[in-house]
Amino acid sequence: MAYRKRGARREANVNNNDRMQEKDVEKQDQNSKTQLSDKVLSKKEEIITDNQEEVKIADEVKKSTKEESKQLLEVLKTKEEHQKEIQYEILQKTIPTFEPKESILKKLEDIKPEQAKKQTKLFRIFEPRQLPIYRANGEKELRNRWYWKLKKDTLPDGDYDVREYFLNLYDQVLTEMPDYLLLKDMAVENKNSRDAGKVVDSETASICDAIFQDEETEGAVRRFIAEMRQRVQADRNVVNYPSILHPIDYAFNEYFLQHQLVEPLNNDIIFNYIPERIRNDVNYILNMDRNLPSTARYIRPNLLQDRLNLHDNFESLWDTITTSNYILARSVVPDLKELVSTEAQIQKMSQDLQLEALTIQSETQFLTGINSQAANDCFKTLIAAMLSQRTMSLDFVTTNYMSLISGMWLLTVVPNDMFIRESLVACQLAIVNTIVYPAFGMQRMHYRNGDPQTPFQIAEQQIQNFQVANWLHFVNNNQFRQVVIDGVLNQVLNDNIRNGHVINQLMEALMQLSRQQFPTMPVDYKRSIQRGILLLSNRLGQLVDLTRLLAYNYETLMACITMNMQHVQTLTTEKLQLTSVTSLCMLIGNATVIPSPQTLFHYYNVNVNFHSNYNERINDAVAIITAANRLNLYQKKMKAIVEDFLKRLHIFDVARVPDDQMYRLRDRLRLLPVEVRRLDIFNLILMNMDQIERASDKIAQGVIIAYRDMQLERDEMYGYVNIARNLDGFQQINLEELMRTGDYAQITNMLLNNQPVALVGALPFITDSSVISLIAKLDATVFAQIVKLRKVDTLKPILYKINSDSNDFYLVANYDWVPTSTTKVYKQVPQQFDFRNSMHMLTSNLTFTVYSDLLAFVSADTVEPINAVAFDNMRIMNEL
């Protein structure tokens, strides 16, 4: 029986195995059926073969296609990333980029008052030069004559180019125009003086020397030079120096002397120069320990406001200015001292959170990123951003409730305008949906992008709780007050923030939230938020102190700003991590920090120097634009003038400023009036353009052309030449007009009718003293080109000289041959040097000292920081 039973068991086992195999076969059949149905329905094309190798190849092909598709995906991804990078680069190009922050700071600090304009020489365009005199037969006489010539003769040919030369000359005068002239500093000894007298500068001395040694100088002039010396009137602090100047140069220097920018300096001026709020701040003790002499002088800084309104429609330029101001402000915000130990604070926080007992992930996040460096960085960022009116963006993690609760303090203290709208909305929405609405069991807020109201404004209308709604109302209406102090527009914080009372309002709202039931949320969620609120509320006193400290440092440094604080959202933003705000709230100690007097003075000086330089460069640009228009420089690119203006401000990357802003800047500059000094200087140049042209050896003022040969005439300055000294009796045609219209018919008709014609305009004045080359060039260069090709712009009139210096002088001696030319160069006579008319007495102060750093005379100290008081006469930090 037993045997039989064993066999039966075996059979049963075999049967079971068969069944299992059958099941497997069925499964395989089903799989194959599904695979077949898939293959039939799928649109993929497959080749069915019996050959195993081909099947392997097909698998490999599949693998390779997969790899190719992967590679293609990667390529597409990189292409997308590349496109994003390109888009970002395009965006960056519309925003001027900056060099490292240190270099901007150095550029700003290196802008000094214009001490470089202190002159050691008088301004001169002309210098006297000796030229030989020629007799009637063309021979050079032994005696010479003095004429006024240009010191730097770079006059180009062509009327338009000459006018451009005068614009460049004007620009040069503007850069060299001294703020003050002290003749004693440049006076030198007159070598020919009997009693060691002095003349005004080294060039006057060298001119006197040359005239004294000239054999033809009259005895009376020599005696006069021997008498030339300074005349001092000590009781009036005045000295007169003799000078030898061309009348135009004299007009310039006399104007500079009469319109100096220096003003008398005394203790009152220095004390009033210090910003009023710092003078009246009881925390700063200012003292002057000496009186200034009566000869002390200073240059009043030019602090006009908002002449170009760069905040209005100049996004890139405004971004650059605010960035440089931000970097400067960060460098002067004091570092926090005696912060709470990070380890000790984290340990205390973890005890408060009971993290040993509870290991809730969200609560361990509360402690991440807390460190003293982040706290200090946050303090500096907040104050510097408000001082420079830089827009901030917030970076946060929604699950970190602690950073959101810290964000509630931040939004209470800092006005809404300081944050980029999208970032502000995101942060407010996170606070509403994570803390405020769950506390009252309200449904999540579904915020539509583009809604004119912020999440807090919507929440204020929906929440019934008075304390929470009251706090939301304060945040929604937290704006800067615009106040003009000492003529500067300041962005002032709300009084409730300045005295710290608003923190009590925030705490009342937080306590109300922590008492709520969070009905729709789990218990752990409610506990997490309650503990986060508890952590912040435990530091109520420190938060009040921190708010007062922030406001005091902001307002004290704000007193040193000289340009209007215009509030406009900036293109780029300063990033602020909410974890660093948590660090600041949790680690702030009880040590007061206030800016040192030296830091304040430095900040004030840098701001004054930049602002003054900004206004002076505006004046220069406006003057150059006006001059270009009055000189009819129709081809002058105004953009180049604007680029120069921006370069001279030092902080701009000019190549990256968009063109639309360049042209808008040009239009704004055109509307401004020209400063009086610069206008007077331009009028001086404009009135004397003719005299300056005459003194040039490079250009003539026109050319007379004719069919018939015109005889060469004797000229005192050159001998036998084809020069005409006047245009009487000739019909005149303006060369520039002729070249612009291109109508040469009038000239050719006149020439064909045997009438000489005078082409008036700035032409090259080239000397060619060889008679042979004169004859060779005559018809080929001048006459043929005018009549046949009708091209006036290629006309190169030549000054032909035939005199005793010439190797071919024997041709002149041969009276059978009369030298002639078909052109006559029209050249005006330069002004002759007359010693009596060129001797001028210049008057200036005998002595004075110009002080550039006025605050160097003020010794300043502060009270002990612990005793420093805020505007309400209460200590800044009360929590000890």
Curated annotation (Swiss-Prot):
Biased amino acid composition, Basic and acidic residues: 19-30
Pfam families according to UniProt: Rota_VP2
A cellular-component GO term for this protein: T=2 icosahedral viral capsid
Cellular localization per UniProt: Virion
GO molecular function, one term: RNA binding
Region 5-fold hub, residue ranges: 1-80
Keywords in alphabetical order: Capsid protein, Inner capsid protein, Repeat, RNA-binding, T=2 icosahedral capsid protein, Ubl conjugation, Virion
Major subcellular site: virion
Chain intervals for the UniProt region annotation (Disordered): 1-43
Keyword Ubl conjugation: yes
Marked site: Interaction with the intermediate capsid protein VP6: 220, 224, 228, 839, 841
Signal peptide: none
UniProt family annotation: Belongs to the rotavirus VP2 family.
Role description: Inner capsid protein that self-assembles to form an icosahedral capsid with a T=2 symmetry, which consists of 120 copies of VP2, with channels at each of its five-fold vertices. This capsid constitutes the innermost concentric layer of the viral mature particle. It encapsidates the polymerase VP1, the capping enzyme VP3 and the genomic dsRNA, thereby defining the core.
HAMAP family: Rota_VP2, Rota_VP2_A
Protein name according to UniProt: Inner capsid protein VP2
